[in-house]
Amino acid sequence: MKKQYNLNLATPPQRGGTAMLTMDAAAVSSGLAFLESELEKLDPLLREPLTSTTYPRDIEIESGGGWVEATSAFNVEYSVTGGQADGVGGIQNAVRRIQADLSKDLYKVLPYEVSMSIKIQDQLRGAVTGRSIEDIYNDGIRLDYDKYMDINTYLGQAAYGTTGLLNDKQITATSVTAGASGQTDWAHKTPTEILNDIDEAIIAGWTGAQYDNSAIPNHILIDPANFAYINRTMVSVNGYPTPVSIMQYLVDHNIAKAKGVDLVIAECRFCIGAGVGKKNRMVAYVNQRRFVGMDVPVPMSRVMTQPNVGTASYDSLYMANVGQVKIHYIDPFIYRDGI
């Protein structure tokens, strides 16, 4: 119940005037609120949601192509009649002949669409408040597009039958070997055992690519917890910590570096639980357009804006045309679970 504070009036002499006015707590409160709003300092910074997107770091994107429904890539396989060992000329009757087998891969391209509707009075109010609702919506759409691209890059669009860097069905995932502790996770492994996991993945990709040096994996994705662990934990020698972190130890001593390849070990939140049995997954691959990439035939932009009398608003449509992740070489692409 609202308390009413009524002041008792002394009985004044009768002079023909009216009684003195009183004010209750509600009236006083609203008046103070108005005064406080006049005195407050407005913070012009609009705090957006905390989030992150990493797809531009982990895949090369090629723009251009228009509103296509698919993109294609051609492959070639070579063979020689008679085999490669028998290449001696002049002492045989038949000359070997080269053959080429061409094939084409098709990749889906899906339209991205999002709209915004701004009432005319909200646009006019922006002139009073100094904050544009259109700019706020535009920032939200940009963030939504980046999140869409993140999911498309790492996981694909399951509803449309596409996959990403972390879950391609053509790649067989295997578990890393257990360490001396009997466990596979890096938190229970020594720096040398972690390096063995890194090198094993790199060598597996290199071996699968017929030891082609250009196919040595140069990019590794791991979950953020393990990324933090190897960066904050120092390598110990005879029980004494050194000023070298496990991360620096891995970067300096992996097999890829011995072959002249600079290895990047980066964190990716989509690696959490991406493996078999919801284990954390490590992914090793060659981060170059020749090996893996993604087409964006039409980058995201505002394609139209028109007034809508029925809703007293301006409606805008944003669109993009985004392709699925294209893994051109499966053999040097490695999944290792259980880290």
Predicted regions and their residues:
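Sequence/fold signature of self-assembling virion shell proteins
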Residues: 1-58, 231-339
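Alpha-helix boundary/N-cap detector
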Residues: 26, 30-33, 37, 107, ...
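Assembly/oligomerization interface modules of large self-assembling protein complexes
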Residues: 32-114
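Alpha-helical scaffold segments that mediate packing/assembly in large oligomeric complexes
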Residues: 113-197
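Residues in well-ordered beta-strands of folded domains
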Residues: 117-119, 221, 317
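Hydrophobic, Leu/Ile/Phe/Ala-enriched alpha-helical segments that form helix-helix packing faces
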Residues: 145, 149-152, 198-209, 250-254
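Extended, solvent-exposed, turn-rich assembly/linker loops in the middle of proteins
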Residues: 166-242
